[in-house]
């Protein structure tokens, strides 16, 4: 049986942790002048993937 392929786009965006997957938050790439410093600071923090999305990500990362 051939090896399963890892989805490289998903591999670059998500990292496996003991409790699931961590990811970077969105809305921090452009149009930043209208966003407050506080909002941008909070968006820098990593967050957990929702429990309902974990099975889909796990399927795309078979060796994570």
From Swiss-Prot:
<dbReference type="InterPro" id="IPR021137">
    <property type="entry name" value="Ribosomal_bL35-like"/>
</dbReference>
<dbReference type="Pfam" id="PF01632">
    <property type="entry name" value="Ribosomal_L35p"/>
</dbReference>
<dbReference type="InterPro" id="IPR018265">
    <property type="entry name" value="Ribosomal_bL35_CS"/>
</dbReference>
<keyword id="KW-0687">Ribonucleoprotein</keyword>
<keyword id="KW-0689">Ribosomal protein</keyword>
<dbReference type="GO" id="GO:0003735">
    <property type="term" value="F:structural constituent of ribosome"/>
</dbReference>
<dbReference type="InterPro" id="IPR001706">
    <property type="entry name" value="Ribosomal_bL35"/>
</dbReference>
<dbReference type="GO" id="GO:0006412">
    <property type="term" value="P:translation"/>
</dbReference>
<comment type="similarity">
    <text>Belongs to the bacterial ribosomal protein bL35 family.</text>
</comment>
<dbReference type="InterPro" id="IPR037229">
    <property type="entry name" value="Ribosomal_bL35_sf"/>
</dbReference>
<dbReference type="GO" id="GO:0022625">
    <property type="term" value="C:cytosolic large ribosomal subunit"/>
</dbReference>
<protein>
    <recommendedName>
        <fullName>Large ribosomal subunit protein bL35</fullName>
    </recommendedName>
</protein>
């Amino acid at each position: 049986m051939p090896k399963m392929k890892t989805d490289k786009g998903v591999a670059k965006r998500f990292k496996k942790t003991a409790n699931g997957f961590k990811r970077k938050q969105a809305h921090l790439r452009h149009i930043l002048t209208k966003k407050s410093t506080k909002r941008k600071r909070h968006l820098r923090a990593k967050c957990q993937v929702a429990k309902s999305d974990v099975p889909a990500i796990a399927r795309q990362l078979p060796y994570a």
